[in-house]
């Protein structure tokens, strides 16, 4: 009886790892032991940075809104507070896009936020 080696599955597994390591430098792209650890590390960084990206974009939207709201005579925090008082439920991404692509529309929204702030004071 012939010994079962599992060579097909092993080759497939190694091939998959080496394919993922394509573009790595030195032994990391061609030797399975180096490639495996490098690919695992790359996947860990990939996972972390996918989570980080969400916060990075939120920070970008807030920075854009701060600039746009100051052009319209409000700080970012007063803009957000005014929008809540006015009952305007636009999220930061939508507001940021509006500030870039439709400044007149953003100015109207900012004025509504201003009026709502003045009404509460």
UniProtKB/Swiss-Prot annotation:
Transmembrane residue ranges: none
Entry GO terms, CC: ribonucleoprotein complex; ribosome
InterPro entries for this protein: Ribosomal_bL20, RIBOSOMAL_L20_CS, Ribosomal_protein_bL20_C
A GO MF label: structural constituent of ribosome
Pfam families from the UniProt entry: Ribosomal_L20
Keywords: Ribonucleoprotein, Ribosomal protein, RNA-binding, rRNA-binding
GO BP field: ribosomal large subunit assembly; translation
Signal peptide segment: none
Keyword Cell division on entry: no
PANTHER family registered for this protein in UniProt: 39S RIBOSOMAL PROTEIN L20
Purpose of the protein: Binds directly to 23S ribosomal RNA and is necessary for the in vitro assembly process of the 50S ribosomal subunit. It is not involved in the protein synthesizing functions of that subunit.
Similarity annotation: Belongs to the bacterial ribosomal protein bL20 family.
Protein name: Large ribosomal subunit protein bL20
Organism: Chlamydia felis (strain Fe/C-56) (Chlamydophila felis)
